[in-house]
Curated annotation (Swiss-Prot):
The gene coding this protein: tsf
Keyword annotations: Cytoplasm, Elongation factor, Protein biosynthesis
Record-given protein name: Elongation factor Ts
Organism name: Pectobacterium carotovorum subsp. carotovorum (strain PC1)
PROSITE patterns in the record: EF_TS_2
Cellular component, GO annotation: cytoplasm
């Protein structure tokens, strides 16, 4: 049984856009042969499904704002990148953000109700659907934010840090996408799910269960580090972890929030040729 390395899984993910679990499973079934894994995934429809899931409504804006020890992050969606850059749409998103900060509103339904009339008027003017999708907030001793264009926004709350450090941490979160602050914060459900996957891979390599379990223990430590902020290599100095960086500054991150436009939304794509053909039949 060939060893299923992290680099092999990464390459398959990059080539197919499929999820990590799906790629691991395909590589195990193909005995580590990446070309065979791709062929099998094409036959099973896994690649097609992954591409469909990746067709998110990736249009709109992420907005962030800090007011003293309180910060808000907001996502407002539209249907095209053209409208996302429209002045009227941008002004609407800014107005919603200001209201969320001023009123400390974290319930998106409250924001939707407050701005429904303006939203409807803007939809009529622009000709695209507009949605106030989500809003969240952080409070903390020191707050930092970072925006990668209008598509990615991050808030970070920390203790004992200066503004520059928190800004750099926010940039790291934008780039590295941690899911938790510290390895010990990784939920038992996530750990157990990954453990079972790794154990199955180790067992299928022909190792005795006792040896396989020891192998998996080491892999799990690596896994919890990879998905947590403090366990990741710092993007501006990969020789040290974010945890080491914080220790050097006698600082601590209490929480962070990362929003990316359209994540989790499936975008409906129009087949232009099919649409024209359908219209010609009707005429």
């Amino acid at each position: 049984m060939a060893e299923i390395t992290a680099s092999l899984v990464k390459e398959l993910r990059e080539r197919t856009a499929a999820g990590m679990m799906e790629c691991k499973k395909a590589l195990v079934e193909a005995n580590g042969d990446i070309e065979l894994a791709i062929e099998n995934m094409r036959k099973s429809g896994a690649i097609k499904a992954a591409k469909k899931a990746g067709n998110v409504a990736a249009d709109g804006v992420i907005k962030t704002k800090i007011d003293g020890n309180y910060a808000v992050i907001l996502e407002v969606n539209c249907q095209t990148d053209f409208v996302a850059k429209d002045g009227g749409f941008q002004a609407f998103a800014d107005k919603v953000l200001d209201a969320a900060v001023a009123g400390k509103i974290t319930d998106v339904d409250v924001l939707k109700a407050q701005f429904e009339e303006e939203r409807v008027a803007l939809v009529a003017k622009i000709g695209e659907n507009i949605n106030i999708r989500r809003v969240s907030a952080l409070e903390g001793e020191v707050l930092g934010n970072y925006q990668h264009g209008a598509r990615i926004g991050v808030l970070v709350a920390a203790k004992g840090a200066d503004e520059e450090l928190v800004k750099h941490l926010a940039m790291h979160v934008a780039a590295s996408k941690p899911e938790f602050v510290k390895p010990e914060d990784v939920s038992a459900e996530v750990v157990d799910k990954e453990y079972q996957v790794q154990l199955e891979i180790a067992m299928q390599s022909g190792k005795p269960k006792e040896i396989a379990e020891k192998m998996v223990e080491g892999r799990m430590k690596k896994f919890t580090g990879e998905v947590s902020l403090t366990g990741q290599p710092f993007v501006m100095d990969p020789a040290k972890s974010v945890g080491q960086l914080l220790k050097e500054h006698n600082a601590d991150v209490t929480n962070f929030i990362r929003f990316e436009v359209g994540e989790g939304i499936e975008k409906v794509e129009t087949d232009f040729a099919a649409e024209v053909a359908a219209m010609s039949k009707q005429s």
